[in-house]
Each structure stands twice: as structure tokens, then as C-alpha cells.
Amino acid sequence: IYNQVPHWSKHFPMPAKLHYRETENPEFIYFPACVTRIFGGSSLGKDDLITVVLRIADKAGIKISVPRSVHGQCCSQIWEHKGDPKGQQITANATVEEFYKLSQNGRIPIFCDTTSCTHTLLTLARHKGLLTPDNLTKLNLLKILDITQWLHDHVMPKVTVKHKKKHVLLHPTCAARLMNVDTVMTEIAHMCADNVTVPPDSYCCGAAGDRGFMFPEVARSATRD
């Protein structure tokens, strides 16, 4: 039981307020990942990620929609991590079906705000037998973007950064490296800061899904430098 119950920390933010935005003829569908919905803004009083993304989209004049039903979807990664193939199969198929419907048969691009979840969605087809033949076809018609790509390609060309940070320290995640969007993250950071540092030895943070909650010593060891 000990290894199945996450360690609690007073630094964990409370759940985010669920935001909905039904937009007529949206340019993008915004999918807030489970981790975004579970953890809200920091204890320092900063806004949660969903609020920030909606505000950025408004500043860029980009019409995005956050339908109510997206809050019930999951990329299925957690089920894979827990060794539950049936749960993974049910969740993955349900999400693909809902995304296909929300995107109007794949016409409207969908972006996800958590890179590891984006990577999971984009690689569902690699799991033989995970998706039904019908949903595999639907998946191939979906246009799924990571938030880094959405920011770089669609937001940054439409906004002007007036107050740059002096220095930003960047930690590209494992999924960002797998998707080759770590360079995209760095380019965005350079647009927002005078100096950007990416530590040469910044590799896995030790989180590994929720494993860092179960074994915090792994995360401490991975980030000790």
C-alpha cells in the first residue's frame, strides 16, 4: 500500500477551476491535460495554466474553444503507466472519438498543454490493437499540436513582448526531446527573455508520470544538480 499512495506536499497547488469556452467557428480546440486540471495556480497567487492560455489567445486574436466535454478526456498515458491495458484501451478510444467529433472530423486543429500527453496522443497508433480500426482512421485525420508548437507558430507572430525577462532557466522535458520541440521551447524563451540557459545535463526530472509522487527520492536524485 505504501508504494501505491502518493506522498503529499504542502506545495501542491489546489485543483484548477474548470474553464469552458464555446466559440463559434474556432481556429483551435484547446485540450487542457489531466495534470493541468488537477493542479491549479501556484500558492503564490498566480493564475492557473488554463486561464493563462485563454488570455494569451485573446491577446493574439486567436479564437479557441474549450468545450465542456474535453475536461472528461485523457490521453490514456496514466493507464499505461499503471499496467492497465484495458483502462488504456477504453480511455484512448473514447478520447479519439470525442476529439474527432469536436474537431469536426479533423478539420479544426487540437492543441494540448502538456507535452508528454501530446506525445502519447501522437503515438497511440504504435500500440497494436489499442484503437479500433474506425478510431485508428479517425486518429490519422486529427491535427494534434503541442502547446509549444501552437505558441511558436501561431501566437508569437501575432504578439509583441514588451517586458522581457532578464534571464530564463529552461528545462526541456523528456517528451519535448522525444518530439524534437525542445528547440522550439528555446526559441520561444529567447523571444521572451534577454538570456536563456538550458543546463547541458538537464535530462529526466524523475517524475515519470506520477512515479515521482510515489518515490520522491527519485525526483530529488534526478534534480540534485
Q: Where do the PLM segments sit?
A:
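Iron-sulfur cluster-binding electron-transfer modules in prokaryotic oxidoreductases
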Residues: 1-225
